Amino acid sequence: MQLNSTEISDLIKQRIEQFEVVSESRNEGTIVAVSDGIIRIHGLADVMQGEMIELPGNRFAIALNLERDSVGAVVMGPYADLAEGVKVKTTGRILEVPVGRGLLGRVVNTLGEPIDGKGPIDNDGFSPVEVIAPGVIERQSVSQPVQTGYKAVDAMIPIGRGQRELIIGDRQTGKTAMAIDAIINQKDSGIKCVYVAIGQKASTIANVVRKLEEHGALANTIVVVATASEAAALQFLAPYSGCSMGEYFRDRGEDALIVYDDLSKQAVAYRQISLLLKRPPGREAYPGDVFYLHSRLLERASRVNEIYVEKFTKGAVTGKTGSLTALPIIETQAGDVSAFVPTNVISITDGQIFLETDLFNSGLRPAVNPGISVSRVGGAAQTKIIKKLSGGIRTALAQYRELAAFSQFASDLDDATRAQLEHGVRVTELMKQKQYAPMSVAAQSVSIFAAEKGYLKSVELKKVGDFEAALLSFMNSEHAALMKLINETGDYNAEIEAELKAGLDKFVATQTW
């Protein structure tokens, strides 16, 4: 079959008429300077604050300094091959990360890319890393507990769903251990967890992931990693990425817990970026907006009301409140809580758990200082039975500390003072707890009941731990129904008190430890 010239020209004309040009207008600029992960770009007239700038090699930078004739941007990744004269483009997009249930059980980097070798992630969409926190009207008061599994915390410094509770202390005082145990304790509670590791060694993070897996908590947890060897920009943005992943559950009427380990390293990364961008330094060389750096992050942790959830899900979820509980960690230097970053975060959060080196070294673990540790809103969320029983624990410990210091100077003590000291030292011993061994509400209740009702008086100090272990074993076997009831309801009444007393009386009379 032969086509004549007329048919060929008609065919070409038809194809030309059908051809659609898809044009995209994008602003292009030129790199004029590169130094330490910071690039200065000329020619990007319409760039937004925080916008992603496309670099060669499928990399991005984030615009942080918008100046009269140039833009200062921080590179998200390696920058060694970038040089003066390289062309870059605006994207019109703010940085987003993948969110959804597919991230549970996975280890990802700041950008939400998997780094655990388990293949691609099945996400439910994307969310911006910078989100405005829910307003006052959209929030609900904190009234449900987050059980950490630690007697010392759940009894004296209770944490509620939607609260921000700071864990603060020097290095090697058990801050990460406490946060990891809190995550492990949520594996059957329905609370989804996010662990954000900032500026840590890769080996340390690998160990944390392994421990979570061993205790069956990884399937319920998202691990976001920005190691010490990664760019300062990734360390600075990691907490915001993790927060967006946690907000996915909060906004759908579920409960989530996020651990930032730790925000001191994030502040250092932000200080590095700010100094390289030539922003004026302030106290301790931190930039002027370092308070806002943490406040805008921690304000996103909240308990939102039913109206907010219904509005967000467009009616798909009704009658449910959502919460995001934050446990930020701050590392102090030589116990100095009055330094710049610690005081900032203390003023933002709803309380703090202060861990002391001296207590840790003396064998008291968790090394919680009950004197300056406080929970400002958790009391309303505390489980009924723990709240009722633990009232005297904090007082006993505070009085014991005071009397112990005083008794060093006094040669003879009256019987009442000696009894208080004996009680205080036994309660202190009872508060000790091993790592990776979180306790149920019922187990905590039995231990605290024994201390409050004077059952420890006749127990040798060095045998308090053995007494507790034997008591819990006895109660779990002989009073399993009571333990189950306490775990399920958390109630405390005369009937439960009578059964606890009967169980303890029988244990003391018949058992050895």
From Swiss-Prot:
Q: Which GO terms describe its cellular component?
A: plasma membrane; proton-transporting ATP synthase complex
InterPro entries per record: ATP_synth_asu-like_sf, ATP_synth_asu_C, ATP_synth_asu_C_sf, ATP_synth_F1_a_nt-bd_dom, ATP_synth_F1_asu, ATPase_a/bsu_AS, ATPase_F1/V1/A1_a/bsu_N, ATPase_F1/V1/A1_a/bsu_N_sf
Q: What class of enzyme is it?
A: translocase
Q: Which GO terms describe its molecular function?
A: ADP binding; ATP binding; proton-transporting ATP synthase activity, rotational mechanism
The way this protein sits in the membrane is described as:
Peripheral membrane protein
> EC number(s) in its UniProt entry?
7.1.2.2
Enumerate the residues binding ATP.
169-176
Domain of life, per UniProt, equals Bacteria
In this chain, the site described as Required for activity is at: 373
Keywords for the protein's UniProt record, in alphabetical order: ATP synthesis, ATP-binding, Cell inner membrane, Cell membrane, CF(1), Hydrogen ion transport, Ion transport, Membrane, Nucleotide-binding, Translocase, Transport
Q: Which reactions appear under catalytic activity for this entry?
A: ATP + H2O + 4 H(+)(in) = ADP + phosphate + 5 H(+)(out)
- Give its localization: Cell inner membrane
> HAMAP family per the record?
ATP_synth_alpha_bact
The record's family statement is: Belongs to the ATPase alpha/beta chains family.
How this chain assembles, per its entry, is: F-type ATPases have 2 components, CF(1) - the catalytic core - and CF(0) - the membrane proton channel. CF(1) has five subunits: alpha(3), beta(3), gamma(1), delta(1), epsilon(1). CF(0) has three main subunits: a(1), b(2) and c(9-12). The alpha and beta chains form an alternating ring which encloses part of the gamma chain. CF(1) is attached to CF(0) by a central stalk formed by the gamma and epsilon chains, while a peripheral stalk is formed by the delta and b chains.
Function summary? Produces ATP from ADP in the presence of a proton gradient across the membrane. The alpha chain is a regulatory subunit.
Protein name, per record: ATP synthase subunit alpha
In the UniProt record, what gene is named as encoding this protein? atpA
